């Protein structure tokens, strides 16, 4: 069963720079950041009051550069952890444009840049933000792998590519309680505004009734023509798994390929803390 889109003709999305021709500003401009209320998606998921999960959106910033006090360029790799309890998520194109505005701006040192990022991002998200910046000599993002078993090699026939949570109906086996970790690299959704493809991998760690792997894979593949932001997709997966399969403990963590020098990696759980950053092979 498909769900009605809460986004169609929504005025909260009308003024986003995403999907529009924009000028690239090279002088520090925090006003370029644009928020999107998280509640826009959560209302459609019937999430009000206390959330059934905690977590964060872990962004990796690959293209950040500024000038030191002598005018010499500095480059770094950054991480921004945006609490899932913040009022807003940050729209990714506006984040890219904001980072570009550092390019011709002088900063005293790396700590000043980090503080500036935290201050601006916290204001936009209206929530807690933690930022780390690393000189390239100290950045150690080794290519890793997701834990658990990959379900992508299941030999199944797929002829439906429209999103539906119905694939998860009766997917939980209440007679068999397990703790297991499953992952898939077949997650694909599309940008909510532009329709451009978003490629991701997702890992699901749960304790509860054993989830039918074929049904889970069909469900994940059904995102293939679904238009939603990364963060919203992960929260939808969490809520659908919890609603249909009723695990006692659940973690959903996705890592998406980068666009515009940024990758977004949403983490949601009711029992675990967010992991250290890493890179998958496609990142």
UniProtKB/Swiss-Prot annotation:
Catalytic center residues: 191 (thioimide intermediate), 198 (proton donor)
Keyword Oxidoreductase assigned: yes
Molecular function GO terms recorded: preQ1 synthase activity
Binding site for NADPH: 92-93, 259-260
UniProt keyword list: Cytoplasm, NADP, Oxidoreductase, Queuosine biosynthesis
Swiss-Prot/TrEMBL GO biological process terms: queuosine biosynthetic process; tRNA modification
Pfam families tied to this protein: QueF, QueF_N
Quaternary structure and partners: Homodimer.
Family: Belongs to the GTP cyclohydrolase I family. QueF type 2 subfamily.
Protein name (Swiss-Prot/TrEMBL): NADPH-dependent 7-cyano-7-deazaguanine reductase
Native species: Tolumonas auensis (strain DSM 9187 / NBRC 110442 / TA 4)
